[in-house]
């Protein structure tokens, strides 16, 4: 693993500003999740709102990605491309993933929303995925925590509920760069990773599947789906390790 950056107080404040805008945008975008709405409508709102508040949507153009945000429905694990012909239906579970650049620094967050009413299984998945993220964040704030402890905490919760943890995608350091060191694995693994240091800033963003953990990428080169067609859910925050534990940097002001 390459050297993990320790951010200064000023850098953390700038990431917090970007994270707050991302969080505020996410809340408003989530209010648009209703049957009959296209994912493109939601995405256009995200782009417009971000620009209005002097931010930049980091996804647009990143390695050729064509939209402002990733909007992933049901069996889509991540990187769902918003489209005019993708119309939300009653019972759809929807992840909206927003990364905002403000003053040169990134804030990255995502959350789950439901169009109409979710099935009991879908709601359990959504709630479990959120708990997985929360427990991963909690593990990162424990004394002498290592990065591998995050994945162990997440895996324990998923196993308890009979769900699986996606291994093909992971969390990451963040700051001036969208994706920096370290790579944050969300599953239990044997790698003896470094201790988490005060000033390390990174995302915790587990993707939890009802079925098996395997994924595949569709022909558009971006959209990742579960191999077995089962539902998937994800929540994400950007956090910083502090002397007292951790602070979530992607909260609304």
Question: Can you describe what each PLM-predicted range is?
Answer:
Residues 1-253:
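Active-site neighborhoods and metal-handling regions in enzymes and metal-associated proteins
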